[in-house]
């Protein structure tokens, strides 16, 4: 076991193609974890181990690796998670960041801030994660460093601390200036030479070193006193940066080129020296004194991911916040009020594994043996009603129907899709009650394409699918009070359930669904509350406009009655479903469609035709800005319904010279004329 203060739980996050996996491969090589550098373009990287990742050259699932790095001040064990950059796999970033203590955000030196950069930045801010920025690809044509830093300050309103400078740019990028140690780091054929600052770089080095020291003095009174008296050391600088990073008062930024092996050692030093240990962060939102980041405290962990291994079964990825566990122990799932047994504890090295005899506070490990625990569940030894903050699951926006070519494979397909949905909470499925079709819903075309590819090739169930369809939602505009009764009398024991529900739209809260119980005086016994909730949850899966799931709705049980003999869970479940269905009919239900945030990068001469096409697609322009390379960046909001085949349209309109990225923005009311078109289909 490692000293907890030396553990670093970090993630690498960025827009797709910013170089996350390439950076991870270099980190693993320079740390001694691997003896050969994997390359994305040859499909032999350690963290992109899935066949689909290697074929496409992208990260699909977050991969965990553990390695070691020593600086002059720390000898650290680093649990590193390489996350996807593609918007379709946002859930992988979300659940990884939930359990990490620090992050490295990569930014491409030539592309700058991109849409998914904003998304992962906001995700890291949501969890108050201390971070380091690494401007990658300084060797690229069009690369910039200082101007990107200014853009970051303007975009995110943050205090950036420049800790190194580039020596040369684009093809002439040869090294960096370490502003902490005031040394030049030069790479010749991947060989590192450390030398004193040359006369050529002396003035700019002094300028930015002074800015660094003055920034630390502004936020750290202890360092200020040493700075005024000119009585500070390198250790004092590092300790001050570390303290301010952990407090989220500053964000260090460095530059390099992962592909060219330049700046990786400096980045590793920065991760270990500046990013927090589990002790520095503690256990967020838990005040129970029985739990602390200590091996002697009670066991407490969050299950943040599950994965079905073809040989080992269900792998449960957990972050341990308090205490310790060993194989063979019985643990308690606080979220579901059930017990589970740990058969094995393993540490993951991407797709390879090592058995452990013990795991303790600060660790990220995998449990084998858990059967009914899934993403977001809190685990402990005792049911003390302690629940860690859950993981936010995004709503799917696109659907396809899936059916097996061989009819006998239907049950196998159904079971497999059910397993995939447990692995990936942003993936949902339902069975069309009229046609019996399996409808699979996900975050985008690529998301569903990967799943279908795994079904066909990895599990050898050949399928046919429909064209992608938009996943609409439904909501309400009016508040309604509605009763529902389910009464049956057939000679023997009857059925009696009676509820009164108040339904109202959620206008402000972030929740998509709220259920509250406000009955008093025992008008309905407590043992029927769960059945009533089940009836409600079943009914909101099918709205009254077009049968889509209902969202942004608050439902309160306010009254009802029961029969001492005839009442049953079944009767109350049906009564709740009946009440809700009738209420939805009266509450001005309406259809919601997903709106996508689209960034288009196009040569200036095609700006007019691109904007005209956006208008035809019911889009709204947010901004049009220059990117200093004779290109225009058009940011817009466009309904997903209008974006099928957009790649072809954009290529045609710009002779193949424009490209675009998109991510989910929100759900918005569908205009009536579009609703009528959907109904006709």
Swiss-Prot record:
CC annotations in GO: cytoplasm
GO MF: GTP binding; GTPase activity; guanosine tetraphosphate binding; translation elongation factor activity
Positions contributing to GTP binding: 14-21, 82-86, 136-139
PROSITE patterns according to UniProt: G_TR_1, G_TR_2
Stored InterPro entries: EF-G-like_DII (IPR053905), EFG_II (IPR041095), EFG_III (IPR009022), EFG_III/V (IPR035647), EFG_IV (IPR047872), EFG_V (IPR035649), EFG_V-like (IPR000640), G_TR_CS (IPR031157)
Compartments where located: Cytoplasm
Gene3D superfamilies reported for this sequence: 3.30.230.10, 3.30.70.240, Elongation Factor G (Translational Gtpase), domain 3 (3.30.70.870), P-loop containing nucleotide triphosphate hydrolases (3.40.50.300), Translation factors (2.40.30.10)
GO BP terms: ribosome disassembly
UniProt superkingdom: Bacteria
Keywords: Cytoplasm, Elongation factor, GTP-binding, Nucleotide-binding, Protein biosynthesis
Domain called tr-type G: residue spans: 5-279
PANTHER family, sorted: RIBOSOME-RELEASING FACTOR 2, MITOCHONDRIAL, TRANSLATION ELONGATION FACTOR G-RELATED
Protein purpose: Catalyzes the GTP-dependent ribosomal translocation step during translation elongation. During this step, the ribosome changes from the pre-translocational (PRE) to the post-translocational (POST) state as the newly formed A-site-bound peptidyl-tRNA and P-site-bound deacylated tRNA move to the P and E sites, respectively. Catalyzes the coordinated movement of the two tRNA molecules, the mRNA and conformational changes in the ribosome.
Protein family membership: Belongs to the TRAFAC class translation factor GTPase superfamily. Classic translation factor GTPase family. EF-G/EF-2 subfamily.
Protein's UniProt name: Elongation factor G
Phylogenetic placement of the source organism: Bacteria, Pseudomonadati, Pseudomonadota, Gammaproteobacteria, Oceanospirillales
């Amino acid at each position: 076991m490692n000293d907890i203060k030396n553990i670093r739980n970090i993630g690498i996050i960025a827009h797709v193609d910013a170089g996350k996996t390439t950076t991870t491969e270099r980190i693993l090589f320079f740390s001694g974890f691997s003896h050969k550098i994997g390359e994305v373009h040859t499909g032999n990287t350690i963290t992109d181990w899935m066949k689909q990742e290697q074929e496409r050259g992208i990260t699909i699932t977050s991969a965990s690796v553990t390695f070691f790095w020593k600086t002059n001040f720390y000898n650290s064990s680093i649990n590193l998670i390489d996350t996807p950059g593609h918007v379709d796999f946002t859930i992988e970033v979300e659940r990884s960041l939930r359990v990490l203590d620090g992050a490295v955000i990569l930014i491409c030196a030539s592309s700058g801030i991109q849409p998914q950069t904003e998304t992962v930045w906001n995700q890291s801010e949501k969890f108050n994660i201390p971070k380091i920025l690494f401007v990658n690809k300084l060797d690229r044509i069009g690369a910039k460093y200082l101007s990107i830093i200014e853009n970051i300050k303007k975009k995110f309103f943050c205090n950036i601390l420049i800790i190194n400078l580039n020596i040369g740019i684009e093809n002439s990028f040869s090294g960096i200036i370490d502003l902490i140690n005031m040394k030049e780091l030069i790479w010749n054929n991947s060989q590192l030479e450390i030398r004193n600052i040359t006369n050529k770089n002396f003035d700019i080095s002094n300028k930015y070193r002074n800015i660094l020291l003055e920034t630390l003095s502004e936020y750290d009174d202890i360092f200020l006193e040493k700075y005024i008296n000119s009585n500070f050391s390198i250790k004092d600088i590092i300790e001050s940066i570390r303290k301010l990073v952990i407090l989220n008062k500053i964000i260090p930024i460095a530059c390099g080129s992962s592909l060219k092996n330049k700046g990786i050692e400096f980045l590793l030093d920065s991760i270990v020296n500046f990013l927090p240990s589990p002790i520095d962060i503690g256990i967020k939102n838990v005040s129970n004194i029985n739990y602390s980041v200590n091996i002697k405290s009670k066991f407490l962990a969050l299950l943040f991911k599950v994965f079905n291994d073809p040989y080992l079964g269900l792998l449960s990825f957990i972050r341990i916040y308090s205490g310790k566990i060993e194989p063979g122990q019985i643990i308690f799932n606080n979220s579901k009020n059930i017990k589970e047994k740990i058969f094995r504890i393993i540490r993951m090295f991407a797709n390879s594994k090592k058995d452990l005899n013990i795991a303790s506070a600060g660790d990220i490990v995998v449990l084998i043996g858990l059967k009914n625990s899934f993403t977001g569940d809190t685990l402990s030894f005792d049911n003390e009603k302690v629940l860690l903050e859950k993981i936010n699951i995004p709503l799917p926006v696109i659907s396809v129907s899936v059916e097996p070519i061989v009819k006998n494979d239907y049950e196998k397909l159904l079971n497999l899709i059910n397993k995939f949905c447990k692995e990936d909470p942003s993936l949902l499925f339902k069975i069309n009650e009229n046609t019996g079709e399996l409808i699979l819903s996900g975050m985008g075309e690529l998301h569903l394409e990967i799943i279908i590819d795994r079904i066909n090739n990895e599990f050898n169930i050949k399928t046919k699918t429909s064209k992608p369809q938009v996943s609409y939602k439904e909501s309400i505009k009016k508040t309604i009070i509605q009763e529902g009764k389910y009464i049956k009398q057939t000679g023997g024991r009857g059925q009696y359930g009676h509820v009164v529900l108040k339904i109202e739209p959620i206008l402000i809260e972030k929740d998509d669904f709220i259920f509250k119980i406000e009955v008093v005086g025992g008008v309905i016994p407590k043992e029927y509350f769960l059945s009533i909730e089940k009836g409600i949850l079943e009914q909101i899966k099918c709205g009254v406009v077009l049968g889509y799931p209902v969202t942004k709705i608050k439902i309160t049980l306010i009254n009802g009655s029961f029969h001492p003999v005839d009442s049953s869970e079944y009767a109350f479940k049906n009564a709740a479903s009946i009440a809700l269905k009738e209420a939805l009919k009266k509450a001005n239900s309406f259809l919601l469609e997903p709106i996508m945030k689209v960034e288009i990068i196009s040569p200036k001469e095609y700006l007019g035709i691109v904007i005209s096409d956006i208008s035809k697609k019911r889009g709204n322009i947010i901004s049009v800005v220059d990117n200093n390379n004779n290109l225009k960046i058009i940011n817009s909001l466009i309904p997903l319904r209008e974006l099928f085949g957009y790649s072809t349209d954009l290529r045609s309109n710009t002779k193949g010279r424009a490209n675009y990225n998109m991510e989910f923005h929100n759900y918005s009311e569908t205009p009536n004329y579009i609703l009528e078109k959907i109904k006709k289909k």
